[in-house]
Amino acid sequence: MAEPRRVAFISLSPVRRREADFAGAEREPPRLEPQPYREPARAEPAPRADAQPPARDKPLPQREVSRAEPPMALQREPPRPEPPPPPLPLQTPPPRESASRAEPPPRPPKETVRLELVLKDPTDESCVEFSYPELLLCGEQRKKLVHTEDPFTDEHKERQEVEMLAKKFEMKYGGKARKHRKDRLQDLIDIGFGYDETDPFIDNSEAYDELVPASLTTKYGGFYINTGTLQFRQASDTEEDDFTDNQKHKPPKVPKIKEDDIEVKKRKRKEEGEKEKKPRKKVPKQLGVVALNSHKSEKKKKRYKDSLSLAAMIRKFQKEKDALKKESTPKVPVTPSSSSLPKPPCVTTALGDDIPDLGLNSADPDLPIFVSTNEHELFQEAENALEMLDDFDFDRLLDATSDGSPLSESGGENGNTTHPTFPSQVVPKVVPTLPEGLPVLLEKRIEDLRVAAKLFDEEGRKKFFTQDMNNILLDIELQLQELGPVIRSGVYSHLEAFVPCNKETLVKRLKKLHLNVQDDRLREPLQKLKLAVSNVMPEQLFKYQEDCQARSQAKCAKLQADEEREKNGSDDDDDEKPGKRVIGPRKKFHWDDTIRTLLCNLVEIKLGCYELEPNKSQSAEDYLKSFMETEVKPLWPKGWMQARMLFKESRSVHNHLTSAPAKKKVIPASKPKVKECSPKKDPKAPASVVASGGGPSTSSSTSIVASASSSSAPAQETICLDDSLDEDLSFPSASLDLVSEALAVINNGNKGPSVGSRLNVPTTKPRPGLREEKLASIMSKLPLATPKKLDSTQTAHSSSLIAGHTGPVPKKPQDLAHTGISSGLIAGSSIQNPKVSLEPLPARLLQQGLQRSSQIHASSSSQTHVSSSQAQAAASSHALGTSEAQDASSLTQVTKVHQHSAVQQNYVSPLQATISKSQTNPVVKLSNNPQLSCSSQLLKTSDKPLMYRLPLSTPSPGNGSQGPHPLVSRTAPSTTTSSNYLAKAMVSQISTQGFKSPFSMAASPKLAASPKPATSPKPLPSPKPSVSPKPSLSAKPSISTKQISKSNPAPKPAVCPSSSSPNTLVAQSSHSTSNNPVHKQPSGMNISRQSPTLNLLPSNRTSGLPTTKTLQAPSKLTNSSSTGTAGKNSLSGIPMNVPASRGSNLNSSGANRTSLSGGTGSGTQGATKPLSTPHRPTSASGSSVVTASVQSTAGASLLANASPLTLMTSPLSVTNQTVTPFGMLGGLVPVTMPFQFPLELLGFGTDTAGVTATSGSTSAALHHSLTQNLLKSLQPGAQHAAALPHSPLPAHLQQAFNDGGQSKGDTKLPRKPQ
């Protein structure tokens, strides 16, 4: 089968072949025998192929010649060499041959045809198919083509082709048409059978049957729809023939029945179908009452064309009833016209089967249609129908009779054939009595209606509801509106007897009339309003035209000027080009009282119509708006009025109906806004923070908050996220004042009276110890009470803690406590504010801090001497965003503490040195403030907030200083650690305070450092990550950070950004600490130990920029050592590492960090490399370095708590407070706080001399470098990096740090759980 085979087909059937063979036999009897050919044809084609050749030797040539088929001859030969293949194709044709055997016999035998077929291998999609008849036809056509040599045979051939084509189409499309007529008889009986009367789309409420006698037919024949008058005509034979011919197309069976019978049957079926439908209707129906007078139909038809009075109708019914009685008494009489028509029994039985309810007792075709089996039943049905129809629908009844329908007299309104048995049934119809106690006027109008209805019946009418009748009905309706529903219903029932409609229709009609009257009432006000508008419009149109002319003139002048400029080649008009598109003056209609009053009157009337609306599908607002759009608005010229303006101007009238929904909509919208601003109960937070410094945490740090609010309230009030950049500029004076006061306090050695005076709370400075105790107690309570309010409460806590830290230090120096509180409050307030107000407050505080720090650094960089380290610390704390007051207080406290105890002074000296360096190094400052924030958060977050403070107190004594001194020392270290931790915590918060504390820190530092150029956006991202970990707190800190970032640039570029960033970090870190209360509690413990650490840190800080990190590192060391001396030693040992870490942090952090560590270029770089390695592993980015520094500073106390916050360091785990700081230092040492937290605050308790000696040079150097670094940090990030001496930080580490700052949110979030 690979190659196509050519198979011989014999087209003739075996019968034909036989005939052909016999013909051949006659010609050559000896050779041709029928059998050999029959068998091959029937059974095996192959044998036939073998047998045929000898037999065809002679006959075939003759046939071929006669056929003149050279092509067929060619076709015949191929199969001979291939006899075997034929069986395959020949097996398929045999059935077709057998099918065609029946038809061919009469036709002359066809000659044998050989077909050559090409068989192809079948595929999955197709196989070879052949149609034997088509092949034969093709063969015949070929024959004709061959034989058509005679040109005169063309016509004959064409005719044959056309006939073949016609037959083909007839067989295809026209066949089997008559086969369906056998079973269609029942279809003619009820053509409407199957019609769903329950379908809501079909309204049969007013339909009724008209029984058509057999002698009549509709004017145009067939069914009709009940619209208008039904016209009848006498049935005629020709019409019947035509009618039946038309019907034949539908039921082909008609020819079998006589046409007359069919005609009658059809009519009967039609009418019976309608009758059958009738019983399905609501009212029972009387069958065939009128059929008996069908012989009188012609006369009646003429009579009914005229309007009939009720009396005439009754008389007519009575006559028909009598006739019916007479004819139906003996038997059911047959109508003369119908009896003349013969009825085949088949039809009768068919009808009887189809209409069993008609009980056919006679073969008469009309009986089943018109007469009920029982006369009594017939009349009984009529009586029932009359009773059910309380009243005739005279209107319809008369209209139907006037239409000329002989049967309409029996047509009731509801489709019932109502034929009264007695005249009394119609005339005395039961009329419901009127309710008692009706108004006299109403009764009079009802009587008028009765009279009018009576006149209408007597005179006959075309229309019942005339204008007079409508007026009477409307008057009745208006009076009924004042009566109760029961009385109204009774009156309606009474009126129903006098109107040609039922009660429901009457009620609807009355309501419609009432509404129409209301609409009529609108016409006059509408007309008045239109007149008023038309009187006013000319003037306004004139003004509008003048405006248009002036505008066009101005436009032309401008175009000319523009053309001149273009000719001159001037580019000055570039800015004005957008203005070239001049829009014409607005078509603004100016209202006056008259028009407004007219509009209100119109709307009031329309509202009255709305009240009358039975189905109020629209709300009052939509109803009025659509009315104004369609009816009122067109009163103005096009374009001069809008529907919304009409609605607005008429609000005084419809406000009671349309205002409620609007209010509902507005209320929900406002609530979300409040939530967004302060997710944690803090919508009022900004105000409270401004007023009290720590809205949510006012209870714990109320005094501190108050002082902070007094010092930073103005900045907080004005600072908003949106205005943060401008806010920085707007409040530099306050920051400068605070800074100057703090400097004065530091220089004078006072306890910060000026700061105290600034701070409302500072007045309590004399009782720093008490304040610290209160703060500690409040803080301890707040964490527990405010865990849910992390955002507001934690922020408050952080601020309070910052203040508290400052406060604790002030325990020894009251001024320091006051100034520390004020600065801490400012920082805390800004932190609290972030929490309370979500963002604005922290931004403000940071901005203030930045401004103050920048101012302090700029103005008092030289003033910071030995004290200058403290002063710088204060300035840095201000920069951090704590507050200048806090800074000053810390300095003052430090000074006093130094004076009070030499031991504490020793510790404080390192702290102060660290603080001064931290001032110089934004990181150090940041770490300080963050520590405060962290500590406050620790107190809040954990049940150990008190523990945190207590550890502070205890460690300070452990340090070997006096109780107060240890407190101060402790406070200072705690503050330092707190600030560091806060920085860290803030960073971790920003980064979701958990997993990558370093990244978090780095991000936070970036926020602080780069706030000035482009870092402010980065801080934002970091806060956002923190938001996810702590939605409420984090979100607020992030916002505050953004604000701070923005404000930082505005204030002095160098210090301000750092300080504000630190504040932000502090706030965030505090948030993060609150998130990890357990860790934070250990942090508290560490902080208490850290007081020595802080002292040690100062020595590190003395080194330079690295001091910040050094401070952090020493914090951890101190925590581990737990003793002030050991802490100091550790600090001295750590300084280089910390600076290195810080340097790396600064490098990683970017411009911010660079600016911070600018002062300690070489030292920081050296430290940066070592730290960078641990930092990278820990946080894979500069962020972790920053966190490390924060953690290291806060490590002992806050870092442990921040360990979770510090994603970086597992060593910061709560369990290992002492070790944690070290681990953090090792891993996180590179952490450089972009924000400078006032480390001086942390080192309040250090001896002035010690601080001066230890950190004097460092302080001066740090301050100088810090100012430079801060300025650089304010500059673009690239510049910062270049300026940083920490650039030696590995490029990959720096990049990782920067990347970490950007992606800290994502990376930190995963780590936060750690």
UniProtKB/Swiss-Prot annotation:
Residues 16-31, 55-67, 560-570, 673-684, 1305-1314 have a biased composition (Basic and acidic residues). Residues 81-96, 1014-1028 have a biased composition (Pro residues). This is Ubinuclein-2. Residues 330-341, 685-709, 849-879, 1003-1013, 1029-1040 have a biased composition (Low complexity). It comes from the Eukaryota. Belongs to the ubinuclein family. The modification N6-acetyllysine is found at K1036, K1116. There is a cross-link at K258 (Glycyl lysine isopeptide (Lys-Gly) (interchain with G-Cter in SUMO2)).
